[in-house]
A protein has these predicted regions:
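Rossmann-fold NAD(P)-binding glycine/threonine-rich loop
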Residues: 88-133
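Structural motif
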Residues: 80-81, 104
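Flexible, glycine/proline-enriched loop segments at strand-loop-helix junctions
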Residues: 84, 131-140, 180-187
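A short, aliphatic-rich alpha-helical micro-motif
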Residues: 75-77, 99
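Short alpha-helices
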Residues: 128-153
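C-terminal substrate-binding/catalytic lobe of Rossmann-fold NAD(P)-dependent oxidoreductases
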Residues: 3, 14-72, 157-160, 164-258
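Glycine-rich Rossmann-fold phosphate-binding loop(s) that bind the pyrophosphate
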Residues: 9-10
């Protein structure tokens, strides 16, 4: 069994944990938390060993009646691979700790490509990550772009893509992130999404822009893709329908009528 440790059991980490438990060749040997937030209930219900991020956090957990199995370094030594789900731009700081322990690691979005050295999407460049000790999974927006554009690139060829990301502001619990009642543009052009897609689809010509809006629901992608050929709309829909993890929703209007 592959021993998996999850560093950061929050919005992403709890979903990763659920996926790992569905595998027949993996087991979760522990999760790391900085504080006993509401996500902890899922970890405790699943009987995951809990590790505090640092030693000085252990009494905090114990004051809530939570048994702590150690700290982050202890889990890193125990695991064969760490799934790093810590907040963006923080996870890369853990690389030296993972290397020192000889533990492989996967970063779940939020990090830049260059410090990690390899970016991964299961549909577009799976084989490129085979044998790597350290891999970065691209962000949710990059994943969405990749899963819809890659089939078009393979089947019809793409001359150019222009895309605008309408981004949700954060998760429901992140009330401090905003914007509250505004639309916040990303002033850098291209936004990071286009270059990020190119880390997993290197031959795609793409330019992106983004705005952030006050909702927690979802992201929206507005895409203009210039294909090398002109397929029928029905053929494009059939192609997407056959693509893993792409779902076509039909028959509902915004007002709820069919």
């Amino acid at each position: 069994m592959i021993k998996v440790g999850i560093n950061g059991y929050g919005t992403i980490g709890k979903r990763v944990a659920e996926a790992v438990t569905l595998q027949d060749d993996m087991e979760i040997v522990g999760i790391v938390k900085t504080k006993p937030t509401y996500e902890m209930k899922g970890a405790l219900d699943a009987n995951y060993p809990v590790f505090a991020s640092t030693k000085n956090k252990i009494p905090f957990f114990e004051s809530y009646g939570i048994n702590v199995s150690g700290v982050t370094e202890d889990l890193v030594k125990k695991a064969d691979v760490i799934i790093d789900c810590t907040p963006g731009k923080l996870g890369v700081n853990n690389m030296d700790m993972y290397k020192k322990a000889g533990t492989k690691a996967i970063w779940q979005g939020g990090e830049k490509h260059d410090p990690i050295g390899a970016s991964f999407n299961s549909l577009t460049n799976y084989s490129e990550s085979i044998g790597k000790d350290y891999v970065r999974v691209v962000s949710c927006n990059t994943t969405g772009l990749s899963r819809t554009l890659y089939p078009l690139l393979n089947e019809y060829g793409i001359d150019n893509v222009q895309a605008v990301m309408v981004r949700r502001s954060g998760d429901p619990k992140d009330s401090d992130r905003g914007p509250i009642n505004s639309i916040e543009p990303v002033l850098n052009v291209p936004s990071h999404h286009g270059p990020d897609v190119q880390t997993v689809i290197s031959n795609l010509n793409i330019q992106t822009m983004a705005v952030k809006v006050p909702t927690t629901i979802m992201h929206v992608h507005c895409i203009v893709a210039e294909l090398e050929s002109e397929p029928e709309v029905s053929k494009v829909l059939e192609l997407w329908d056959a693509t893993p993890r792409v779902n076509l929703i039909e028959g509902f209007l915004a007002n709820g009528e069919s």
